[in-house]
Amino acid sequence: MKLIIGVITLFPQMFDALKSGVIGRALKQDRLTLSFWNPRDYATDPHRTVDDRPYGGGPGMVMKFEPLALALKAAKAQLGENTKVIHLTPQGKLLTQAIVREKIHASPLILLAGRYEGIDERLIEAEVDEEWSIGDYILSGGELPAMVLIDAMTRLLPGVLGHKDSASQDSFTAGLLDYLHYTRPEKIADRPVPSVLLSGDHEAISRWRLKQSLGRTWQRRQDLIKRRSLSENEQRLLDEFFEESS
């Protein structure tokens, strides 16, 4: 599987940070291809203008239709006319791990990173297939959300992570938060590693990890538990967690 992503952005240099770590490894392995189109390169006036004042008044500027439309046209000429366009915006649907798993199979994708007060709505109506948000807060532009999405999708590519089970055991992959992690030394001050992790009993370790995952999810994200239909074993482990924590 190869992930092909195009990005429409005024600041392609921001994405240089992706050349490190997991994403950098995927790029070197040719498991991931990133391409960029800057709307400013498609502005037709001498000042290469990409924004203008909003109709109806108000603060800030709005990204213009024409440069974005031409940038998207160039991107689709390279990636394919039917390539889906994803607009990163606080008004979008909340991005979840389930969506990431689904959309990795929709490659190639074009990510549209807006700036200023937003994008002319006519561009969104004409060109955008879906709108996604990474949370209920405001950033200066769509570049960071685009990088979040690229990172989340790249992690799911087979062979990109150091261990084959790393992605499958991440938080949210099974609809739960991650279990607790420990490494050497065995004891720090008065805080030892839980003895079960030193036992070598893989079944007991798996049981403990699931119990901690269920308990942590209940403590921090009860909405995830309520959306999940717990098995008898999971309910029993969650009850044990409550008893041990009381």
Curated annotation (Swiss-Prot):
InterPro entries: Alpha/beta_knot_MTases (IPR029028), tRNA_m1G_MeTrfase_C_sf (IPR023148), tRNA_m1G_MeTrfase_TrmD (IPR002649), tRNA_m1G_MTases_N (IPR029026), tRNA_MeTrfase_TRMD/TRM10 (IPR016009). It is found in: Cytoplasm. GO terms for cellular component: cytosol. Keywords: Cytoplasm, Methyltransferase, S-adenosyl-L-methionine, Transferase, tRNA processing. GO terms for biological process: tRNA N1-guanine methylation. It is an enzyme of class 2 (transferase). The keyword ATP-binding does not apply. S-adenosyl-L-methionine binds at residues 114, 134-139. One of its GO terms (molecular function) is tRNA (guanine(37)-N1)-methyltransferase activity. Signal peptide: none annotated. Its main location: cytoplasm. It catalyses: guanosine(37) in tRNA + S-adenosyl-L-methionine = N(1)-methylguanosine(37) in tRNA + S-adenosyl-L-homocysteine + H(+). Homodimer. Specifically methylates guanosine-37 in various tRNAs. This is tRNA (guanine-N(1)-)-methyltransferase. It comes from Coxiella burnetii (strain RSA 331 / Henzerling II).
